[in-house]
């Protein structure tokens, strides 16, 4: 029996990057998961898939969604946003909320983040990637539109 391919949509607009080229070993060495990164250019971050928000960092810069089939998806906004301690990021949901792909999760104050010289490279990761097969990321250097373009796919 063939397992249907699961797809994750772009949680933000911007240009895609290969995870291996992200200038932070936590991400480039896949210590927190496998996927890709997007250099954020939009002020809204959406859910890339259906599921439950299973984790929301206190500093608001990252959240995880657990899908119905147990896959953990992490959206990490920027590389050094943790130093902002939540400033410039407004959560629109909280841990435990059921969300659908495309639901707005965070609102970003891009002018403030840019003024503070925050690196907006934003990893989109499958944390428990060893539980999925055929993980495929869109090619690097592609402009993607928030909520429109599929950026990662896998089978369970």
Segment roles from a protein language model:
Residues 1-156:
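Contiguous, well-folded functional domains in the mature portion of proteins
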């Amino acid at each position: 029996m063939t397992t249907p391919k699961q797809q994750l949509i772009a949680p933000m607009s911007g240009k895609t990057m290969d995870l291996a080229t992200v200038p932070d070993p936590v991400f480039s060495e896949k210590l927190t998961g496998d996927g890709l990164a997007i250099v954020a250019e939009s002020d809204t971050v959406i859910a890339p898939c259906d599921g439950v928000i299973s984790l929301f960092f206190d500093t608001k810069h990252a959240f995880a969604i657990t899908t119905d089939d147990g896959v953990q998806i992490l959206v990490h906004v920027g590389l050094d946003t943790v130093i902002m301690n939540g400033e410039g990021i407004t959560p629109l949901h909280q841990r435990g909320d059921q969300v659908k792909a495309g639901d707005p999760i965070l609102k970003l104050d891009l002018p403030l983040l840019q003024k503070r010289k925050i690196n907006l490279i934003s990893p989109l990761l499958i944390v428990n990637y060893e539980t999925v097969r055929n993980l495929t990321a869109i090619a690097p250097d592609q402009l993607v539109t928030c909520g429109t373009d599929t950026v990662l796919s896998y089978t369970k």
